[in-house]
Swiss-Prot record:
Gene: C2orf74
Regions that span the bilayer: 8-28
Major location (coarse): membrane
Protein name in the entry: Uncharacterized protein C2orf74
Lineage, opening ranks: Eukaryota, Metazoa, Chordata, Craniata, Vertebrata
Pfam families given in the database record: DUF4642
Membrane topology: Single-pass membrane protein
Length: 187
């Protein structure tokens, strides 16, 4: 094969690729403009207290029934302050405002629920342990102290720190959950 035939073959392959890219671009633009022209536009009635002077809902234009739900959510959330994109959040005022007795009652209810869940599991077991004189002791699962915590002095050049992660689980669980995680860093 000569240089000319190789160059012509390369040029033809390059031309075919370019034509395919242009065809994909034309199809994409056609779909975009077809979607804009086919939509029906309706004005959303204003529900502002000022009679619609500064109503953001009147400026919103709906196009499809599917979009109506999304725009309705935007209109409903106009007065909601922006939340930071960080997982760590402060506790809500409701949680801070609850008296200490209510918190203790809530904790006692949670413990009762845990104990109720454990009792049916143990009810199915045979009574051999009671016959032998042994007692069943319900112990809560706690973290055992690690070797590092039991040492009197820390290792040289190692820093231990405790990190608290607070996760907001949304509307389903209104109180944020916090988890502690320990890690060590070498200097």
């Amino acid at each position: 094969m000569s240089f000319e035939t190789t160059a012509i073959t390369f040029f033809i392959i390059l031309l075919i690729c370019l034509i395919c890219i242009l065809l994909l671009l034309v199809v994409f633009l056609y779909k975009c403009f077809q979607g804009r022209k086919g939509k029906e536009t309706k004005k959303v009635p204003c529900t502002d207290a000022n009679g619609g002077v500064d109503c953001a809902a009147a400026k919103v234009v709906t196009s499809n029934p599917e979009d109506h739900e999304r725009i309705l959510m935007q209109v409903m959330n106009l007065n909601v302050p922006m939340r930071p994109g960080i997982l760590v959040q402060r506790q809500s005022k409701e949680v801070l405002a609850t008296p200490l007795e209510n918190r203790r009652d809530m904790e006692a209810e949670e413990e009762n629920q845990i104990n109720e869940k454990q009792e049916p599991e143990n009810a199915g077991e045979t009574g051999q342990e009671e016959d032998d004189g042994l007692q069943k002791i319900h112990t809560s699962v706690t973290r055992t102290p690690s070797v590092v915590e039991s040492q009197k002095r820390p290792l040289k050049g190692v820093t231990f720190s405790r990190e608290v992660i607070v996760v907001d689980l949304g509307n389903e669980y209104p109180t944020p959950r916090s988890y502690t995680r320990e890690h060590k860093e070498r200097k």
